[in-house]
């Protein structure tokens, strides 16, 4: 019998880690709440055309699909919560005309892992701001992301920032077909210099040189001035560089900051500023975000939008384990005499564990015990 085995890249979360997960999640959601973000809980399963937009091949491949025996339509297990929140803003909260701030926390399921150490069941936590196109909204989301990570215990963060509209503006001006643009987009994501050179060999100047320059335009804020001299003066390029400069000024001294104009490792729906947070010693981003204006258009309401998300399972791998709180042992033989005192302690937030077998302090996760006293009950050390 091997029915206890789980699928590849799927794992249980055991008690010590589960406590840390729930504690971190609660702290993050509270941080969102005090910043004005309202919690939503989208369903795990939806019709596939709500979860995946046409042309989003990456998300489509990630999404588990099954048939609905009630309607006959195809369903999907969500692989990303952002499209669901966009649907909620566009359809269920459509009466709101101003800024809407929403947050969420829940499991998503991927048909394939995103990396060798990744889970196929990430625990996605995120926050999104709808209804304001100004760079101030992006700054708010970046600040919220950094504060969330710092509160969780991540130190010495690095923030990488890019702008996908710069690439898309160049692709449109160069007259690239959607297929070629998507292929070149993938080559830039993978930093494939030889592939990029081959793909743009027939592209007219100045766009050919611009595409070849993109992978070289990375580094501190000074690289933005270099970009102004190497990229053609297109509206999308000018706006993108202006917004990146605004982020450079806003984040100066706040966090280690770098810019990468070929950093396009976002999602299909991103439209502008993109950013990722990195921790020392880890090559993969621990949180990502960006602008995705008009993501709700297919739900009947196009609005400016920006947000970020993280995988709490991944994040916990880089955080130090916290010493769990210890409980109070009460021997089963003291019940029901001690029942009132046990109830009082639990009401105060103490963990009180009934010991039926005379187990050790380590087994019970207790460092104190409830013992009889002359005037009732008292706590004594338990080793």
Swiss-Prot record:
Required for the first step of histidine biosynthesis. May allow the feedback regulation of ATP phosphoribosyltransferase activity by histidine. GO terms for molecular function: histidine-tRNA ligase activity. GO terms for biological process: histidyl-tRNA aminoacylation; L-histidine biosynthetic process. The keyword Cytoplasm applies. Keywords: Amino-acid biosynthesis, Cytoplasm, Histidine biosynthesis. HAMAP family: HisZ (MF_00125). The lineage of its organism: Bacteria, Pseudomonadati, Pseudomonadota, Betaproteobacteria, Neisseriales. Its main location: cytoplasm. GO terms for cellular component: cytoplasm. Heteromultimer composed of HisG and HisZ subunits. It is found in: Cytoplasm. CDD domains: HisRS-like_core (cd00773). Belongs to the class-II aminoacyl-tRNA synthetase family. HisZ subfamily. Pathway: Amino-acid biosynthesis; L-histidine biosynthesis; L-histidine from 5-phospho-alpha-D-ribose 1-diphosphate: step 1/9. Pfam families: tRNA-synt_His. This is ATP phosphoribosyltransferase regulatory subunit. This function is generally fulfilled by the C-terminal part of HisG, which is missing in some bacteria such as this one. SUPFAM superfamilies: Class II aaRS and biotin synthetases.
């Amino acid at each position: 019998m091997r029915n206890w085995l789980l699928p590849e890249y799927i794992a249980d979360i055991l008690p010590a880690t589960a406590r840390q997960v729930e504690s971190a999640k609660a702290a993050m959601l509270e941080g969102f709440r005090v910043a004005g973000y309202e919690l939503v809980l989208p369903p795990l399963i939806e019709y596939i055309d709500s979860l995946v937009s046409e042309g989003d091949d990456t998300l489509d491949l990630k999404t588990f699909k099954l048939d609905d025996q009630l309607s006959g339509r195809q369903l999907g297990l969500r692989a990303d919560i952002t499209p669901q929140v966009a649907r909620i803003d566009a359809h269920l909260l459509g009466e709101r005309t101003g800024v809407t701030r929403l947050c969420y926390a829940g499991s998503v399921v991927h048909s394939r892992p995103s990396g060798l150490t990744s889970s196929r069941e990430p625990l996605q936590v995120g926050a999104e701001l709808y209804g304001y196109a100004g760079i101030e909204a992006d700054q708010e989301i970046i600040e919220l992301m950094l504060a969330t990570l710092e509160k969780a215990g991540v130190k010495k963060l690095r923030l990488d920032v890019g702008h996908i509209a710069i690439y898309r503006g160049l692709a449109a001006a160069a007259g690239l077909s959607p297929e070629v643009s998507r292929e070149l987009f993938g080559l830039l994501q993978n930093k494939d210099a030889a592939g990029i050179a081959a793909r743009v060999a027939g592209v007219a100047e100045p766009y050919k040189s611009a595409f070849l320059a993109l992978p070289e335009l990375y580094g501190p804020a000074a690289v933005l001035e270099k970009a102004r001299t190497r990229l053609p003066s297109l509206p999308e390029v000018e706006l993108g560089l202006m917004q990146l400069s605004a982020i450079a000024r806003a984040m100066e001294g706040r966090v280690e900051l770098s810019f990468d104009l070929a950093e396009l490792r976002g999602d299909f729906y991103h439209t502008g500023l993109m950013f990722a947070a990195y921790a020392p010693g880890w090559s993969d981003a621990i949180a990502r975000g960006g602008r995705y204006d008009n993501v709700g258009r297919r739900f009947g309401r196009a609005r400016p939008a920006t947000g970020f998300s993280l995988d709490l399972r991944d994040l916990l791998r880089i955080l130090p384990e916290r010493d769990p709180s210890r409980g109070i042992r009460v021997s089963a033989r003291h019940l029901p005499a001690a029942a009132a005192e046990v109830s009082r302690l639990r009401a105060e937030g103490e963990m009180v564990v009934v010991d039926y077998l005379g187990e050790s302090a380590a087994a019970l996760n207790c460092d104190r015990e409830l013992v009889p006293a002359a005037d009732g009950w008292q706590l004594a050390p338990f080793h």
